[in-house]
C-alpha cells in the first residue's frame, strides 16, 4: 500500500460488504473482489465500511474483520485503503481508528454522529478531533453526507481552521449535491492541498470542473472503467468526450433511480456485473427484486456496459 503521506486522489470504490444468504459476512470473496476492481475496473483505491458497505449495520467486531481482510488481500495490489470508522459512540470510533492504524490502513474517515447530533461546527470538530487523536499518524477525512446524518453544518464552514485543531486532517468525502458548498470548500482552501473527494457519482464531471481531486462512489465498483475514461478525457481537455461519458453514466443511474436504487440494488448490480456473489443486505434493508435485476441488466447491456450478445434488437443506445 501507499505511504500514508500520499494524497488520496482519483477513483475510490466505496466497497460492498459481501454477505451470505443468512446475513453473515462472506469474507471468502474479498480477495476476488480486490482482483476484480484492479484488473477489470482499473480502480486501486477503496473506502471500506462506509454507507455502501453497510458499516453502521455491522458490529464493531465485524467492522474490524472486514477492514483486516481488505488490508490483507489488498497488500501490494491496492494503492490506498481508507477505513470508515464513524459511529454513534465516540469510544467505538476511537477503537475502530486505533484498529485501522494497527492493521496498516492508509487513512480513516468519519461521519458526523447522527442520533445525538452536534449542533454547530465547534462541537462537531471536537468530536472529530477526539477520533483523529486515536490514530494520529493516519490521514483523517471527514465524510460529509447530510442527507443521511441530518447534520446540516456546511462543509465550507467546517474546513475553516480545521487543520489547526486536527493536524492529521487531509480532506473530505463530499456526498451532497450542494455544489456551492463544494465549490467554496475548494476555493477557500487552495493553498492547503486538501483532498476533495466528490461522492455523487452522477455529478462528478461538474465537481471536477470545480476542483475535485477524486471521487468516492458505489458505481465505481462496476462502472469504474467507464468513469476513468471520463477522467482521462477531462485531463486531456477533451470536454466534449468527458461530457458524453458523464451523460452515458447518468442514463444508467437515472434509470435505476426511477426503479428504486440504494445499497440493496448496488449489491445486486455488482453481483451481476462482476460474477462475485455479494448476497443480500442486512436488515432493515431488503433484497433487490428479480424484476429490478432483470431491468438493470437490460439497461447495462443497452448502454454497452455488459456484453450485448443476448440482445435480439441490437445495441441502440450504446455509449462510445
UniProtKB/Swiss-Prot annotation:
One BP term from GO: N-acetylneuraminate catabolic process
Pathway(s) it belongs to: Amino-sugar metabolism; N-acetylneuraminate degradation
Summary of subunit composition and partner proteins: Homotetramer.
Name of the featured protein: N-acetylneuraminate lyase
Principal location listed in the UniProt entry: cytoplasm
Family membership: Belongs to the DapA family. NanA subfamily.
Gene, per the UniProt record: NPL
Catalytic activity line of the entry: aceneuramate = aldehydo-N-acetyl-D-mannosamine + pyruvate
Species, as recorded: Bos taurus (Bovine)
Entry's localization field: Cytoplasm
Function recorded in the entry: Catalyzes the cleavage of N-acetylneuraminic acid (sialic acid) to form pyruvate and N-acetylmannosamine via a Schiff base intermediate. It prevents sialic acids from being recycled and returning to the cell surface. Involved in the N-glycolylneuraminic acid (Neu5Gc) degradation pathway.
Residues forming the catalytic site: 143 (proton donor), 173 (schiff-base intermediate with substrate)
Entry keywords, A to Z: Carbohydrate metabolism, Cytoplasm, Lyase, Schiff base
CDD domains (UniProt xref): NAL
Taxon lineage: Eukaryota, Metazoa, Chordata, Craniata, Vertebrata
Binding locations of aceneuramate: 51-52, 175, 199, 201-202, 218
The protein's Enzyme Commission number: 4.1.3.3
An example Gene Ontology CC term for this record: cytoplasm
Class of this enzyme: lyase
GO molecular function, one term: N-acetylneuraminate lyase activity
Gene3D superfamilies for this protein: Aldolase class I (3.20.20.70)
